[in-house]
């Protein structure tokens, strides 16, 4: 999907069409509710610099940003929304 998005960004850029990706970290949703024990949650949070799980609003805000004029010169990018979980 990421490669396809980059290819589309390159192809559609001349037409002023922006194509970007959002890669979410662990997000609290109805699907994840009740699945993580306290110990599992503590272990996960230990690896997230922001010390919390994400929620749907975090992803929605990223999408709003990418769709706004604030990101008017951004195309072909991957925006990690994971609280810093994948900092290398």
Language-model features, listed with the residues they occupy:
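Alpha-helical segment proximal to the catalytic Tyr-Lys
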Residues: 10-14, 72
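Short-chain dehydrogenase/reductase
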Residues: 5, 60-63, 67
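A short C-terminal helix-loop "cap" of Rossmann-like NAD(P)-dependent dehydrogenase/epimerase domains
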Residues: 34-48
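A conserved structural motif in NAD(P)-dependent oxidoreductases
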Residues: 48-59, 70
């Amino acid at each position: 999907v990421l490669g396809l998005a980059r290819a589309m960004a390159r192809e559609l850029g001349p037409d002023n069409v922006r194509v970007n990706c959002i890669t979410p970290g662990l997000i609290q949703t109805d699907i994840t509710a009740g699945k993580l024990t306290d110990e599992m949650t503590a272990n996960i949070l230990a690896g997230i610099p922001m010390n919390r799980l994400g929620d749907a609003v975090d992803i929605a805000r990223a999408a709003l940003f990418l769709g706004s004029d604030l990101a008017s010169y951004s195309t072909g990018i991957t925006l990690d929304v994971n609280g810093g979980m994948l900092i290398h």
